[in-house]
Structures are given as C-alpha cells and as structure tokens.
Amino acid sequence: MLEKLIERVLFATRWLLAPLCIAMSLVLVVLGYVFMKELWHMLSHLDTISETDLVLSALGLVDLLFMAGLVLMVLLASYESFVSKLDKVDASEITWLKHTDFNALKLKVSLSIVAISAIFLLKRYMSLEDVLSSIPKDTPLSHNPIFWQVVIHLVFVCSALLTAVTNNIAFSQKERH
C-alpha cells in the first residue's frame, strides 16, 4: 500500500514539468519578437544596406529560426515524453513527434546546436577583417577569440558525432536481443 502511494506521488510529479513547458513557450514568443524586430530593421534599411550586412542579417534570422525550432522540438517532445500525450492534436500534424524518443531528441538537439554554431561562425567569417583588425598581430593563438570559437564548434561537432555513434551502437545491440 505504501509502495503504491509512493509510486502514484512520484508519477504525479511529472505534472511539475507542465508549467515549465508553458514558460518555455514564452521563449518562442520572445524569439518571434526578436525575429520580427530584426526583419523589420533589415527591410527598413533595404536601400542602404550593404551586401555583407544583408547576408549577416539573413544569417541572424536563420539562427533565430533554428533556435525557435530547437525550443519547439524540445518543448513538445518533453511534454509528450514526460507529462502527457498530445491527444487533442491532429496526429498527422505531429507525426515526427511520434518517432522522437529521448535518444532521437538528443541527436536532433546536438545537430541543431552544431547548425547554430556553424551559423555563428559563418557570421564571424563574414566580418573576419573587423575581428582580425581588433587583435594585435603578436597575440598568441590561445588569446584569439576566433580560435576558441572554432574549437568550441569542433567540440559540438564531435559531441554530435559521438551521440550518433552511441545511439547507433545502442540501437543495433537492442535489435540483436
């Protein structure tokens, strides 16, 4: 009897995630606001914007879109996995969610982080002259911010690859048993 009570209480604690999911949806609102603000800024300066600034603005919008997609994916998958099934929604609208288990979500998050990091590096590459001109010529590599940004990006790439390999090994072993 005590065991059943403990199990029910523990299982009911999943609903503590629901307010967090709702709060996380506010992050989407903020990202949407920033996206629209950046888009408006780009459109309002269309006559005077340089090609480089246009590309940088577009990359910024893509970055915000990736981030919003990442937030939405984690939000929906977390709710579906840990709180409650999304049974009120047309199943054809969220078919990807039915195939997203925790391991697939980890991989998608890892790949999204790599994509966001790559966009950040591409934006830095587009303004490379400005960045390099602000660094003294005799600065050691360990003090160069671009060096560390590339290193961090490579860590993200390696992490995503290791996640994919680990998932692949785990799923292939699961299929054998």
UniProtKB/Swiss-Prot annotation:
InterPro entries for this protein: UPF0114, UPF0114_bac
Predominant location: membrane
Mode of membrane association: Multi-pass membrane protein
Keyword match Transcription: no
Name by which UniProt lists this protein: UPF0114 protein jhp_0175
Subcellular location: Cell membrane
Family assignment from sequence similarity: Belongs to the UPF0114 family.
Membrane-spanning segments: 15-35, 54-74, 145-165
Organism of derivation: Helicobacter pylori (strain J99 / ATCC 700824) (Campylobacter pylori J99)
GO cellular component: plasma membrane
Disulfide bonds: none
Domain of life of the organism encoding this protein: Bacteria
Entry-linked HAMAP family: UPF0114 (MF_00143)
Keyword line: Cell membrane, Membrane, Transmembrane, Transmembrane helix
Species classification: Bacteria, Pseudomonadati, Campylobacterota, Epsilonproteobacteria, Campylobacterales
